[in-house]
A protein has these predicted regions:
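Short catalytic helix/loop segments, enriched in acidic residues and glycine
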Residues: 36-60
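Active-site glycine-rich loop that binds ribose-phosphate moieties when present
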Residues: 100, 136-162, 170-174
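C-terminal accessory domains and tails appended to enzymatic cores
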Residues: 208-292
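Active-site rim beta-loop-alpha module in soluble metabolic enzymes
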Residues: 158-220
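Glycine-rich loop at the start of a catalytic domain that most often binds anionic cofactors/ligands
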Residues: 78-91
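A glycine-rich helix N-cap at a beta->alpha junction
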Residues: 90-108
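Extreme N-terminal starter segment of soluble prokaryotic enzymes
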Residues: 16-20
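Short glycine-enriched loops at secondary-structure junctions
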Residues: 23-29, 77, 118-124, 173-174
Length: 292
């Protein structure tokens, strides 16, 4: 169920003293398949935030078992206030709440030795459980340097800018397929198999916990700073309606390049993602009722 199918892993190799960050999203968590599972306030959300917290704790167990001395969990879904702090493994710290300068990747610039993408999902325009990129429906596609980009690909590019390797990615099978391309050395944990955007064949929490803990421990063999990959980047965003492209093109660095498409260049990935966040915020604010 992981990229290396957990074969031939041998004995556990401890890597002491490593600082790790976990970027935790919810759509790719154990059992999640439906909108109400991840929308704050619904009865289903209250149930699945516990499963989400369980996934995080399973990863924390593996990271700490393999020698991680400091783990920061960046809560990265929606309001970014979904994980249950009172149930979190006490060996971790949690960054919770919105309006973080680096959003899902807040903390990657603090000298960490590796990052885990937990509960991730496929990008807008692709098959996958609850697939999207930042906005649930308004964005139909994102491209990073002419390559279709999920949140995982965008975040991996930011991690590379700080010399931080992606150690592990978890989610459905489509998420794992995506990660094989943008982070081929990462451990992968498939917690469910996509049937449609709103249906999946799911493994029970006891099984996913075992997989997540084992893969997290194995992933620590790759922990350690790498050479920073800094350079210019271009992001293009396609929307489901023309007025969203018009609205976001008011940003000085953003150009409307098609009826529903905008693009912009940035000197580095950090600045690219800051601009992308502004694009998504303006687009979300321009949605008008059932017409979008």
């Amino acid at each position: 169920m992981t990229h290396r199918d957990r074969e031939g892993a041998g004995g556990l190799v401890r890597v002491p003293g490593m600082r790790i960050m976990v970027s935790a999203d919810m759509e790719g968590a154990t059992g999640v398949t439906w909108t109400d599972d991840v929308v704050p306030g619904s009865p289903q959300w209250d149930r699945f935030r516990r499963l989400f917290t369980g996934d995080v704790n399973a990863v924390l167990a593996g990271l700490c078992e393999a020698g991680a001395s400091d783990v920061l969990v960046n809560e990265a879904h929606s309001s970014q206030r979904n994980l249950l702090l009172e149930d979190l493994d006490p060996r971790a710290r949690m960054l919770t709440g919105r309006h973080k300068p680096l959003s899902m990747m807040q903390g990657v610039d603090s000298g960490v030795d590796g990052v885990v993408f937990l509960g991730y999902h496929a990008g807008a325009g692709f098959d996958g459980v609850l697939s999207h990129t930042y906005l649930e429906n308004q964005i139909t596609g994102v491209w990073l340097d002419d390559v279709p980009a999920s949140e995982g690909r965008l975040n991996a590019a930011m991690a590379a800018e700080y010399g931080v390797p992606v150690l592990l990615v978890s989610g459905d099978d489509k998420t794992c397929d995506d990660a094989r391309d943008y982070s081929p050395e990462a451990e992968l944990v498939q917690v469910k198999e996509c049937v449609s955007r709103y249906a999946a064949i799911c493994l029970p929490p006891a099984r996913t916990a075992e997989l997540l803990t084992g893969a997290a421990a194995d992933s620590m063999a790759r922990a350690g700073r790498e050479e920073r990959q800094v350079g210019t980047h271009r992001i293009e965003v396609e929307f489901d309606a023309s007025h969203l492209a018009q609205a976001t093109a008011v940003i000085p660095t953003v150009e409307q390049i098609g009826t529903r498409r905008v693009g912009f260049d940035a000197p580095n990935m950090t600045e690219a993602m800051k601009c992308f966040k502004v694009v998504t915020a303006i687009a979300a604010g321009a949605v008008q009722g059932i017409y979008g």
